Amino acid sequence: DEAPDFVKQVTAKMMEGRGEQIKVSEMPDDGRWPTATTQWEKRNIAVQVSQWEPEACIQCGRCSLVCPHGCIRMKVATPEALREAGADSTFKTVDAIGKEFKDMKFTIQVSTPDCCGCTLCVSVCPGRKKGADGKKTEERALFMETNTQELREREAPHWKTFLALPEVDEKLINVGT
């Protein structure tokens, strides 16, 4: 496991309900908690987790903004960056919207072990799938799917690929729109 010793010796015991086994000497002297430790707290508590339908997405970012656990992330990347990050044919992307993102791909990835299944992302999603007649349906770009072992195994490599993608150059983002 890649987790730091503090996470293994203290945080993990607390999460497992074994806090009484933590030695006083293992606790920080000044009471401060190390930063970035939540990245190791994969609880998988949701019965259902959100999934993304790229073709229905309008790339507004509401889902990422409203997610209380920060497990819905968005990125824009070049096809080359996607290849370098290890994206395969199952990694979902769609052409990015906006002239500043010409020839780039947009992706949303959900960290399924962090999702609590609250459905806030689905309720704020304005993106709708289109039916055979070309009209919008009630099906949204984000939807809930049962959090099975198969789903977790399918999505884990996608999350790893997503994290390997570079962050978008902030100069490309027009904050005035």
Regions found by a protein language model. Give the residues of each.
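Ferredoxin-type iron-sulfur electron-transfer modules and their immediate structural context
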Residues: 1-109, 114-115, 122-177
